[in-house]
Design a protein with these regions (language model features):
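Residues that mark the start of a beta-strand
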Residues: 165-169
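Non-heme iron-sulfur electron-transfer modules
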Residues: 1-26, 38-88, 92-137
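Residue-level signal for short, function-critical loop segments
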Residues: 19, 174-176
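Surface-exposed acidic, glycine/proline-enriched linker/cap segments
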Residues: 57-76, 141-164
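Short hydrophobic segments within beta-strands
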Residues: 114, 171-173
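Glycine- and acidic-residue-enriched helix-capping/strand-helix junction motifs
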Residues: 125-130, 179-186
Length: 186
């Protein structure tokens, strides 16, 4: 959201729609572009950075629209002018490296302010060894690991060696009711 003008019942909202470099009206979601993309160093944000993704990707399973997006910080064509593999293999002709951000203006009667949330910084709690041991994970990371569309396809594996653990310890509410300043007092 770039700008909001107006009053309850009559808001005019200016929205920036970031360039995805893929035409939403042409992309079929076939994923051939993802299979062929040579840039595979981007961390998969949706999977809590537990695995990598290609420079062109569909943000998450069942995304609406089910259309790929290109990460301009990872795409070799956008960074160096060389590559273009996804465009070559896109049978729908959906790849557009010249796409720019769009600004949309919409009218709304009401606005819901959803501020989101920020996960607690687990690194501040050294006693759990999160920074030192790959097999110490957060509940959100566990959720992605156990999800059928997650990085392990729902198989419970240790991140360090991809073997099944024999025992686990589940520590809940790390940082809640914390008065040291690292967590939340509530």
């Amino acid at each position: 959201v770039e700008e909001v003008k107006g009053f309850v019942g009559n808001f005019k909202v200016k929205i920036r729609k970031k360039a995805r470099f893929v035409d939403e009206t042409k992309c079929t979601g076939c994923k051939v572009c993802m299979e062929k993309c040579p840039s595979r160093k981007g961390l998969n944000e949706f999977n809590m950075n537990l695995n990598n993704r290609t420079a062109i990707y569909i943000p998450f399973a069942q995304a609406i629209p089910n259309v790929a997006v290109i990460d301009p910080t990872q795409c070799l064509k956008l960074k160096t002018g060389k590559c273009g593999v996804c465009q070559k293999f896109c049978g729908a002709g959906a790849i557009n490296y010249d796409m720019k951000d769009e600004f949309l203006e919409r009218e709304y009667g009401a606005i819901v302010v959803a501020t989101g949330f920020r996960p607690i910084n687990i690194d501040a709690f050294n006693e759990y060894g999160y920074s030192d041991n790959k097999d110490v994970i957060t509940s959100l990371e566990l959720e992605r690991i156990m999800n059928a569309a997650g990085p392990t396809k729902g198989h419970f594996e240790r991140p360090s060696d991809h073997t099944q653990p024999k025992k686990i310890v589940f520590v809940q509410c790390v940082g809640s009711r914390d008065t040291s300043g690292c967590g939340k007092e509530y």
